[in-house]
Amino acid sequence: GADLSVETDAKGVRHIRLVGEAELKPQVIEVPGDPSSAAFPIVAALITPGSEVTVTHVGMNPTRTGIFKMLEAMGADLAYSNERIVGGEPVADITARHSALTGIEVPPDVAPSMIDEFPIFFVAASMAQGRTITSGLDELRVKESDRLALMAAGLIAIGAKVEEREDGLVIDGSGGEPLEGGTTIASALDHRIAMSFAVAGQHCYRGVTVDDVSPIATSFPTFEAMLAELSGQ
């Protein structure tokens, strides 16, 4: 019921105008699943031998799907089904199967479409064959934590080969072999750091302990139950 208009001026700047006061009417709104949350079980399946996972109702807006495109560039076996439009947004179910991943160089212009997914992408890269190079990720230093520094330190602690650069990480993967693990990772109260290392622990010889998982409730309150179910616990 709102009187709302969106216009783009000659310089390409969008102007959103809202005229109030309006009489708002209740509506049923179906919200697509978050691609950021979907990335965690998908990467867990990709790095764990014998695994296959289907995540349903994932939002596939092109501005948010960089993580899936880069995983596919690494050789990820991802299948899309039940593609449809929900609330004006493209949605699909994604099936991920264990895959032999290969390192890639991620173009900096892809970063905006997967900026929140880089922590779990780094985990995938640490298990891949060969070198993965990322750059243009300065924004990761000013998220809920310095995600470049924390991911580099954490991955090194569990046995990965990582070079931290000012605007990205260079990761030489394990070739699909499990990492050593067996250490406790500081999440720095960052939900994505905590979830990323929880997933990494699924493919480590001695597992991984995350010091504080409470921040996970910020974005994915059922994450621990989901990961336990996927692990057969």
PLM ranges: what are they?
Residues 1-233:
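Short, structured segments at the rim of ligand-binding sites
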